[in-house]
């Protein structure tokens, strides 16, 4: 039965691992952005659980949905999913996830910042778009937004277009699809937000430190 139920990742996803980088934050610090492994899912889930009862800025619904997605990934019940981490020193300060619908379309899932006010969310959102377009070969990025903050920043300032609604609906609850093409990425997003491209390679000591991250002690809201 497991062979029937298991969501097996496409070979191209396994070959294209996100290259770690350092990205500067508003407070002058730098975070390591790297791809998570399934073995790290239980620890990431502990961080997400801190927000499931936070009734502010839609953290609760985002946390519950993100928890379900990462748990599904851990248990091989979501296909072609990837999870990126933002780590400041040795502390987990944010996560983003997405999945490939096919080799042409990437589906944005969720963005969670565990440290507010330093630009973690947009930096990580940029990183998951970067992975889809530059490493996995996507032609379009399909996003939707549950929070006003996400809609205001990535859904407005980053100038995505919209698919016809309700004729076309995002897999997250049948909501509106905000999409960015490969051309939009190269000619606008990547240029305007080039600061999020960061520095590569990550120094070995910082990368090693990021491998054993600590989760936040409490929700930062």
Question: Predicted regions span which residues?
Answer:
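Conserved N-terminal entry element of GNAT/NAT acetyltransferase domains
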Residues: 1-39, 195-221
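Acidic, small-residue rich beta-repeat scaffolds with periodic aromatic anchors
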Residues: 161-164, 180, 188-203
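Short, high-confidence coil segments that cap the C-terminus of an alpha-helix
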Residues: 81, 136-138
């Amino acid at each position: 039965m497991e062979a029937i139920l298991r969501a097996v990742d496409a070979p191209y996803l396994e070959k294209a691992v996100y290259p770690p980088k350092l990205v500067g934050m508003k407070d002058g610090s730098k975070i390591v952005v790297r791809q998570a492994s399934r073995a790290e899912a239980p620890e990431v889930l502990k961080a997400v659980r801190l927000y499931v009862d936070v009734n502010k800025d839609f953290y609760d619904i985002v946390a519950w949905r993100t928890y379900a997605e990462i748990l599904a990934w851990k248990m091989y019940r979501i296909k072609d999913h990837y999870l990126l981490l933002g780590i400041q020193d040795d502390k987990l300060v944010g996560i983003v996830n997405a999945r490939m619908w096919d080799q042409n379309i990437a589906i944005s899932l969720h963005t969670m910042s565990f440290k507010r006010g330093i630009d973690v969310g947009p930096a990580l959102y940029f990183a998951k778009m970067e992975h889809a377009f530059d490493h996995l070969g996507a032609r379009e990025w399909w996003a939707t937004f549950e929070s006003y903050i996400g809609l205001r920043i990535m859904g407005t300032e980053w100038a995505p277009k919209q698919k016809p609604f309700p004729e076309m609906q995002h897999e997250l609850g049948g909501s509106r699809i905000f999409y960015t093409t490969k051309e939009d990425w190269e000619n606008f997003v990547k240029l305007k937000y080039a600061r999020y491209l960061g520095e590569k390679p990550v120094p070995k000591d910082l990368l090693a430190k990021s491998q054993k991250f600590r989760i936040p002690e409490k929700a930062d809201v």
